[in-house]
Every structure is written in C-alpha cells, then in structure tokens.
C-alpha cells in the first residue's frame, strides 16, 4: 500500500519489516510484493530476470533531501584554518567563506560544474542514494543562480540519480549590494526563474544578520505566489522562530533546527512540515546537535540529510549521517531508516512516488551486504550497500 503521509513521532519506529517475500518489478514500478509461491500463481515469471538477494536486507533507496550539490572550486585550506582556531569572520577576511564559493561558481563554466557535481552524485549513488535535492545559492546573481539550476536540470537527464531542484538566491547577501535591494531583485526574478528552470522549491537562509524573519516572510510569500513549494534553513544558530513561522506558511520542510524553540517543536508536531536534521554539519562545525529525541517524542516527522556543501559540511557520507544520528542524537536505526526514506520523500514532495517498497511505487531499492538492516549502524562508518536498483534497473553493483 502507498504511504500517504510522513511518519510522525513514535510511528517513525515502525518500518514494516517483511521476511521471505520477493519483489516483482515491471518496467520502473513495483508490481507486487509477496512470497514466491503467490507470485508464481498470479504471474508468468518464465521470462523474469532474477536478482538474487537471498540472505540480504533490501530497503527503499535513500533520499538526500538537503544538499548544495553544485559549486565551483574547493575550500580545503579553509578547513585547516578552522581547525587552527580561526572564527568565521577571520576566515571571511582571509578570502574564505561563502564568498569564495560564490566567486569560484561564477567563474566556472556549466561544463565544469556538471563534471564536479556528477562525481559527487556517483559517490552518493554508491551509498544507496537514489534521489537528491539540490539547491542553487552560490551565484547570488540571476545569471549564475540560473546556471546552477540548469546544471541540476542537465544532471537529472544524464545521471541515474533523480534530482529535485531548489532555488536559493536568498543564501547570503552579495558584496556591495544592500539587503533590501537584493531582496527586491530576488522577488522580481521569481517569475523568470519559474518560467526558465525546473526549480520546484524556494529556500531562504533565515538567520540573524542575514535574512531575518521579516525578510524571510516577504521572500517566502512572494515565492508561494509564483507557485514554488517552500523550504527554510531555520533556527540553526539563533532561535528566530523560523520553524513555527514556516509551519504557518505550510512549508514542505524546516531544516537544521539546532536552536528550535518549544513553540517551534509544538508547531512542527501539529503541522505537516518535515523537520530535516543535518547532523554532519553540527559534527563538522563542532556544535551541539539538533534535539532529535525531543522532536520525535513531541510527535514531529523527522528527515535526515547530508547538507553536502563546500564549507560547513563537505561530506555526502550516508554512513556518517547514520552513525551521528544514532550515536550523537540517540535515534534508533529504524527511526533513521524512516528519516532517510519515507520522511525524506515527504521533504521533497515525492511521497506518492518513492520512499517505501510498495506496489505502484517507483522501483528504487538497495540491497545491503548483510541479512539485517542493523548492519547500517553496527558496521560503523562503512558503506553496507552492495547493489542499487533505480527505476527497475541495476545501476550500481559492488563486486566484492
């Protein structure tokens, strides 16, 4: 059966384990899930191709619902500055920070951006990721933001991984432009972006001294008018009330939430906005983690994502996310699986297509190199994915 909504609170623990069944796939869809004898009685399987997963655990493909996949250049040296004790402002003054990525992304050709992001997608696919949300936000001008979105569009056509596109010009305020002027320019360009790109979502970095709550309200309301679904980088550094605000906007997800307030937790529990947690970023920045247990125990729907980006979390590692979620945020492995599958599907408006092994859904699934999904956390930090099936085709097979 189709899961028609995300799993909230204690329901995140229920993953619907099935033993001794086989999955029948026709074209790119799941046709049936049943014991072999039932399938043989109902279907002619003489010509069926068999993928033997005997003794292995099979899960839905993972969905990485928050990434900054496309950027130019790299900032490896900056990480060493951070380790030596420099704060963000010092790094900015040395030519690092988001401004460095903006400069390099503006300078990069579309082909260079495609080549770099394609390699990242290859890495993600090997770890069982079959759908990725990808944001713009390293252009901070119409030309480069659109270039990033077109890269996402082209990658979606050439790569096995499905991509979901998010317009995020409101990621930072570009040098030499006043905030009000920049906000007005973003709003003026919304119609053009909607018309000329495949961007489905609009996202804002809602933070003190960047886009405050009033700025965010103005931007999200304008984006909604133009038909964008909404996301928000909310309550990461300072509790501005972003979570409770985006629930009133019926946003698809509120992401980060390290500093979410009690009112924010309550609003997320009562609404349908997914709370997307990004433990890799907290780990990389050596900050406290988002309050996963508090959110779950209050009845929220949690997703987990990598936040892959060139600065605060240069990692697409799903094994790392799983380890941090379980060991640093006290989530169970079942809750983590829910957060990387069905709830992550909800976070990209794909609940009816992907996120669970169900009849009629897209045949996106992964086979682990172990009989139990417990291997995902038991074999710490190691990729347990042996085979990836995307739209009914084997797109990755580990040969050891």
For each predicted feature, which ranges?
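N-terminal metal-binding scaffold of metallo-dependent hydrolase/deaminase domains
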Residues: 1-42, 373-375
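Metal-associated gating/positioning segment near the N- to mid-region
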Residues: 48-116
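Catalytic core of soluble alpha/beta enzymes
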Residues: 182-197, 211-297, 313-315
């Amino acid at each position: 059966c189709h899961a028609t909504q995300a799993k909230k609170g204690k329901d995140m623990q229920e993953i619907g384990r099935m033993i001794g069944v086989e999955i029948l796939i026709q074209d790119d869809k799941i046709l049936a899930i049943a014991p072999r004898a039932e399938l043989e009685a109902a279907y002619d399987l003489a010509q069926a191709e068999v993928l033997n997963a005997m003794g292995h655990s099979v899960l839905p493909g993972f969905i990485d619902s928050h990434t900054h996949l496309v950027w130019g250049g790299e900032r490896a040296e900056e990480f060493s500055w951070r380790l030596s004790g420099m704060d963000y402002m010092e790094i900015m003054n040395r030519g690092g920070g988001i401004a460095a990525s903006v400069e390099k992304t503006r300078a990069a050709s579309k082909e260079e951006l495609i080549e770099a992001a394609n390699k990242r997608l290859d890495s993600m696919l090997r770890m069982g990721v079959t759908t990725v949300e990808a944001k713009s936000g390293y252009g901070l001008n119409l030309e480069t933001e659109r270039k990033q979105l077109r890269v996402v569009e082209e990658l979606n056509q050439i790569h096995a991984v499905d991509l979901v596109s998010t317009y995020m010009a409101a990621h930072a305020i570009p040098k030499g432009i006043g905030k009000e002027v920049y906000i007005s320019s973003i709003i003026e360009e919304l119609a053009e972006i909607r018309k000329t790109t495949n961007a489905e979502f609009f996202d804002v970095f809602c933070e003190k001294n960047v886009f405050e709550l009033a700025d965010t309200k103005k931007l999200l309301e304008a984006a909604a008018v133009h038909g964008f679904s909404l996301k928000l980088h909310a309550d990461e550094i300072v509790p501005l009330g972003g979570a409770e605000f985006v629930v009133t906007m019926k946003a698809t997800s509120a992401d980060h939430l390290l500093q979410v307030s009690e009112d924010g937790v309550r609003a997320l529990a009562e609404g349908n906005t997914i709370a997307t947690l990004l433990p890799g970023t907290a780990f990389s920045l050596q900050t406290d983690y988002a309050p996963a247990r508090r959110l779950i125990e209050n009845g929220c729907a949690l997703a987990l994502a990598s936040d892959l980006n060139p600065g605060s979390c240069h990692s697409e590692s799903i094994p790392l996310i799983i380890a941090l979620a379980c060991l640093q945020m006290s989530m169970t492995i079942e809750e983590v699986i829910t957060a990387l599958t069905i709830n992550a599907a909800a976070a990209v408006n794909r609940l009816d297509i992907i996120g669970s092994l169900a009849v009629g859904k897209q045949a996106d699934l992964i086979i682990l190199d172990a009989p139990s999904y417990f291997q995902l956390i038991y074999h710490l930090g190691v990729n347990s994915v042996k085979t990836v099936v995307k739209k009914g085709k084997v797109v990755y097979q580990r040969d050891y």
